[in-house]
Amino acid sequence: SDDNDVAAEMMSGLIALAIDSCCSDSDCNANHPDMCS
């Protein structure tokens, strides 16, 4: 279960990075307004 926790933390970290890079891109931000507040 520890391995699963680490994998989940890594995934959420990668998702957060992807969302940040998306929200700093005007086209991606416009396509995903629900992710970018």
UniProtKB/Swiss-Prot annotation:
The keyword Aminoacyl-tRNA synthetase does not apply. It holds the Pfam family Toxin_8. Residues 1-21 form a propeptide. It is found in: Secreted. Transmembrane segments: none annotated. GO terms for molecular function: acetylcholine receptor inhibitor activity; ion channel regulator activity; toxin activity. Residues 24-26 are annotated as: Lacks the Ser-Xaa-Pro motif that is crucial for potent interaction with nAChR. Keywords: Acetylcholine receptor inhibiting toxin, Disulfide bond, Ion channel impairing toxin, Neurotoxin, Postsynaptic neurotoxin, Secreted, Toxin. It comes from the Eukaryota. Its main location: secreted. Disulfide bonds join 22-28, 23-36. Belongs to the conotoxin A superfamily. Alpha-conotoxins act on postsynaptic membranes, they bind to the nicotinic acetylcholine receptors (nAChR) and thus inhibit them. Has possibly a distinct nAChR binding mode from other alpha-conotoxins, due to a different three residue motif (lacks the Ser-Xaa-Pro motif). The cysteine framework is I (CC-C-C). Alpha4/7 pattern. This is Alpha-conotoxin-like Lp1.9.
